[in-house]
């Protein structure tokens, strides 16, 4: 029935306005989850249409009444159908994901960038890192697409950055993005599990590790099932990876070095597990309970 409807759309719809309305109706009908870039059916449909037609992503209105060629219409409707029927996140259909002013290549080898950490780099880490030039060596654990490593290179122009992931597939995607930004000389991609085998020390360590607990993994919307499970689940309480980071980070931080970790909705569980650690919870667009900061000295119990 759905495929018949799309065939009918190909025959009867003519303008971008027509196809936008059709897409929004189909997305709502399909009960899609929006959380990988947009938060509603209209914006998702507009993005997919504009991207597929190679139009500016911020200029929908001037093109609403433009008629499409049959080949263009076929291509746009094919993308809309895949989003509606297969629940594939838009970023995997376009192979593009945005974080702030940066865009990255993505595919199903990596999770779609959505960490709040990027909002905190630079000014957001003062007074712990008073000047960006004080960061000479930085580490991105669980780098995935390499998005945070690339943004660290932007904010900390004097820094050499190690970007680590246990997934070779993810590192291949990170390599594409590092090359796209011309940062091969500043970002080193390393295949390892967290700190294993690392020898350097760092002024800043950031990580957006897996943090979804086992029960929540089973309840994730269908869209998340297209993402690598390795990058989502982290044990019964979602803290397996974070525990390893807290156990080892101090050994890899320079004096006054900073650890920045995102943990999703696990703040209460984490604080209950580590009552002795003086976590600082930083304000992001998602709230103040998603990203914590600790210094090397705090991890060692020296302050």
Swiss-Prot record:
Catalytic activity, as annotated: L-glutaminyl-[ribosomal protein uL3] + S-adenosyl-L-methionine = N(5)-methyl-L-glutaminyl-[ribosomal protein uL3] + S-adenosyl-L-homocysteine + H(+)
Q: Biological process GO terms, please?
A: methylation
Tell me a Gene Ontology molecular-function term this record carries: protein-glutamine N-methyltransferase activity
Q: Does the keyword S-adenosyl-L-methionine apply?
A: yes
A Pfam family annotated for this chain is MTS
InterPro entries per record: DNA_methylase_N6_adenine_CS, HemK-like, Ribosome_uL3_MTase, SAM-dependent_MTases_sf, Small_mtfrase_dom
GO cellular component labels: cytosol
* Enzyme Commission number, as recorded: 2.1.1.298
UniProt keyword terms in alphabetical order: Methyltransferase, S-adenosyl-L-methionine, Transferase
Assigned protein family: Belongs to the protein N5-glutamine methyltransferase family. PrmB subfamily.
Describe the task this protein carries out.
Methylates large ribosomal subunit protein uL3 on a specific glutamine residue.
Q: What is this protein called?
A: Ribosomal protein uL3 glutamine methyltransferase
Q: What does the organism's lineage look like at the top?
A: Bacteria, Pseudomonadati, Pseudomonadota, Betaproteobacteria, Neisseriales
